[in-house]
From Swiss-Prot:
Domain of life: Bacteria
InterPro entries: Ribosomal_uS10, Ribosomal_uS10_CS, Ribosomal_uS10_dom, Ribosomal_uS10_dom_sf
SUPFAM superfamilies for the chain: Ribosomal protein S10
Function summary: Involved in the binding of tRNA to the ribosomes.
NCBIfam families: PRK00596.1, rpsJ_bact
Lineage of origin: Bacteria, Pseudomonadati, Pseudomonadota, Gammaproteobacteria, Lysobacterales
Quaternary structure (record): Part of the 30S ribosomal subunit.
Protein name per its UniProtKB record: Small ribosomal subunit protein uS10
KW Ribosomal protein (keyword) present: yes
Gene3D superfamilies referenced in this protein's UniProt entry, alphabetically: Ribosomal protein S10 domain (3.30.70.600)
Length: 103
């Protein structure tokens, strides 16, 4: 039988928030006896927006904004029931998007 694995993908706009959440997940998984791979940083997605400031003329007057989406991947190898229960009870920050896939 192949080993079971939980893959957790984290997304957030603030890198400090995502790193703190990843360390909480790693700490919780290690405390229950599971082996953890990661957190692996994925490329940061940068979206830039250019907006004209002037309502009529002046194409030279523009503001530029950007959003950075930081991503991390964690693999929990061979988790047990205690690991799954502890991860379900874990409360992370509100600005972190968590996707969990069981393979």
């Amino acid at each position: 039988m192949s080993e079971q694995k939980i893959r957790i993908r984290l997304k957030a706009f603030d890198h400090r928030l995502i790193d703190r959440s990843a360390s909480e997940i790693v700490e919780t998984a290690k405390r229950t006896g599971a082996q953890v791979r990661g957190p692996i940083p994925l490329p940061t997605k940068i979206e830039r927006y250019t907006i004209l400031v002037s309502p009529h003329a002046d194409k030279d007057a523009r503001d530029q904004y950007e959003t950075r989406t930081h991503k991390r991947v964690l693999d929990i190898v061979d988790p047990n029931d205690k690991t799954v229960d502890a991860l379900m009870k874990l409360e992370l920050a509100a600005g972190v998007d968590v996707q969990i896939k069981l393979t």
